[in-house]
UniProtKB/Swiss-Prot annotation:
GO terms for cellular component: plasma membrane; proton-transporting ATP synthase complex. This is ATP synthase subunit delta. It comes from Bordetella petrii (strain ATCC BAA-461 / DSM 12804 / CCUG 43448). It is found in: Cell inner membrane. NCBIfam families: ATP_synt_delta, PRK05758.2-2. Pfam families: OSCP (PF00213). F-type ATPases have 2 components, F(1) - the catalytic core - and F(0) - the membrane proton channel. F(1) has five subunits: alpha(3), beta(3), gamma(1), delta(1), epsilon(1). F(0) has three main subunits: a(1), b(2) and c(10-14). The alpha and beta chains form an alternating ring which encloses part of the gamma chain. F(1) is attached to F(0) by a central stalk formed by the gamma and epsilon chains, while a peripheral stalk is formed by the delta and b chains. One of its GO terms (molecular function) is proton-transporting ATP synthase activity, rotational mechanism.
Length: 179
């Protein structure tokens, strides 16, 4: 995976640079890149894009035809570049890096919150306020429920994980007793 990230990085940085200078703005570009990544991540599309019988022009037309949003010329050029360099299937990785660059630029981060139970809006707000103080960033929450946690929450912000779930506490206790 590290190799894919390394190959995708220059494309994500170039795309971010173009998006930052565009009047449509970073959020519009992030949505569009997310859609492109979703199309590129489809198994049928991946299979078609690796078909040796298709030329570059056919791949470009096929791929752009599957995208619902009208593509600006800069994005069409980007897709042509990816196809010419056999990098179109890296779009999901490029999109992830683009969002990371966008978040860093905006001073924000995605907070993946996993809870054992459904959290109310007030609970999410209170948790995010505490986490924003801890991480020093404006956080965008994404909440999922995983009953296997038994209780508590697990929060991932970037590469940092804060796990206060009962499941994690039991695992630590088990490891301590086994040692």
């Amino acid at each position: 995976m590290a190799e894919l990230s390394t190959v995708a990085r220059p494309y994500a940085e170039a795309l971010f640079s173009a998006a930052r200078d565009d009047k449509a703005g970073l959020p519009a570009w992030a949505d569009l890149i997310g859609e492109l990544a979703q199309v590129a991540g489809n198994p049928d599309v991946r299979e078609a894009m690796t078909d040796p019988r298709l030329g570059d022009a056919q791949r470009i037309e096929l791929f752009t035809g599957l995208v619902k949003t009208q593509l600006p010329q800069a994005v069409r050029n980007f897709i042509e570049l990816l196809v010419a360099n056999d990098r179109l299937l890296l779009l999901p990785v490029i999109a992830k890096q683009f969002v990371a660059l966008k978040n860093r630029h905006e001073g924000t981060a995605q907070a993946e919150i996993t809870s054992a139970f459904e959290l109310s809006d007030a609970q999410v707000k209170e948790l995010i306020e505490a986490l924003e103080t801890k991480f020093g960033l404006k956080l965008k929450p994404s909440v999922t429920v995983d009953k296997s946690l038994i209780g508590g929450v697990r929060v991932a912000v970037g590469d940092q994980v804060l796990d206060t779930s009962v499941q994690a506490q039991l695992a630590r206790l088990r490891d301590t007793l086994a040692a």
